[in-house]
């Protein structure tokens, strides 16, 4: 592959950019995937504590691209979903919505999971493994696009390393604050929800049995997503775990994040409830301000 004259250049090696580059490469398109960070850093345990819910159709795509074999042992099926509400006093309602996977048959008519929960680090590692094996994809990282020149036939990318690439099409997968969107003159509407999502892993006494739960509390949604039991090499052998996305008003979330472990544990357990027995957070706490960026358009010259 002439890596300097490409069919596609993808800027940004996150989940979306990596998946796009792999799909293009597997379709026979000469592709470059560029990111300013070393790719190994994306799979470090401390990089990102989030998980991803993979829907049934997305799982079929991962399987078709050869990614799923590396994920199957790390993916926890979602068999049921329960959604409940709480009043302004924070007390949970005794009523809830229940979605059962047995009522959502797959194409062959047999019950199938409603989705799978996978840690982002394992998802990135599986994508990187397949990308490294795809001869039509060149991984360029760490490196950075410092200038672009575009015309109706192609785009030229000038990299910080001094390298120059020409591609028939460029895709920006840099995220909501991507520099290429701004360079292309594509405006965006943005606003903050004045909320913060606290992300962590919790261990609990009883198994979750593949049930994903979400409580709509006064401060925001509190999601409990089923994870695989802990692995021996992580010091969590056999421990029942859930991924937590705990949304609160920004001011309250900041105060919660500053609490000492015993007080944080008490606030967390009060929201989680006792349906899985004693529960406690394990490992780091991550936090993400919540907002929305909506681009005015999603295409431009090349």
Residue ranges of predicted features:
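Conserved FAD/dinucleotide-binding core of flavoprotein oxidoreductases
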Residues: 97-100, 217-292
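Conserved Rossmann-like nucleotide-cofactor binding loop
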Residues: 16, 39, 177
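N-terminal Rossmann-like FAD-binding beta1-loop-alpha1 element of flavoenzymes
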Residues: 6-33
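Central beta-strand plus flanking loop segment that forms part of the substrate or channel wall
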Residues: 177-213, 220-222, 250-252, 268-272
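FAD-binding beta-loop-beta segment adjacent to the flavin cofactor pocket
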Residues: 288-302
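Glycine-rich FAD pyrophosphate-binding loop
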Residues: 25-50
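Conserved N-terminal helical subregion
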Residues: 2-4, 74-183, 191-196, 252
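N-terminal FAD cofactor-binding segment of flavoenzymes
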Residues: 46-88
């Amino acid at each position: 592959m002439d890596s300097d004259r490409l069919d596609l250049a993808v800027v940004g090696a996150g989940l979306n950019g990596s998946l796009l580059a792999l799909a293009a490469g597997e379709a026979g398109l000469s592709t470059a995937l560029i990111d300013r960070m070393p790719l190994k850093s994306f799979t470090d345990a401390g990089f990102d504590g989030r998980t991803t819910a993979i829907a049934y159709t997305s799982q079929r795509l991962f399987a078709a691209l050869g990614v799923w074999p590396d994920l199957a042992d790390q993916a926890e099926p979602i068999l049921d979903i329960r959604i409940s509400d709480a009043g302004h006093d924070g007390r949970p309602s005794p009523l809830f919505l229940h979605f059962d996977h047995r009522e959502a048959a797959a194409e062959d008519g047999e019950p199938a999971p409603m989705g799978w929960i996978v840690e982002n680090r394992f998802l990135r590692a599986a994508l990187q493994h397949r990308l490294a094996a795809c001869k039509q994809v060149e991984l360029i990282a760490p490196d950075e696009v410092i200038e672009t020149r575009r015309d109706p036939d192609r785009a030229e990318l000038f990299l910080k390393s001094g390298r120059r690439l020409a591609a028939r099409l460029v895709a920006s997968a840099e995220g909501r604050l991507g520099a290429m969107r701004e360079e292309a003159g594509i405006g965006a509407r943005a606003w903050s929800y004045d909320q913060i999502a606290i992300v962590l892993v919790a261990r609990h006494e009883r198994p979750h049995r593949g049930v994903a739960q979400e409580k709509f509390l006064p401060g925001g949604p509190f999601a409990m997503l089923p994870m695989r039991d802990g692995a021996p090499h992580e010091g969590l052998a056999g421990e029942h775990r859930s991924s937590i996305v705990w949304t609160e008003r920004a001011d309250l979330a900041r105060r919660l994040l500053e609490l000492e472990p015993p007080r944080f544990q008490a606030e967390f357990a009060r929201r989680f409830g006792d349906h899985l027995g004693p529960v406690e957070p394990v490992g780091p706490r991550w936090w993400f301000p919540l907002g929305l960026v909506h681009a005015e358009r999603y295409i431009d010259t090349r």
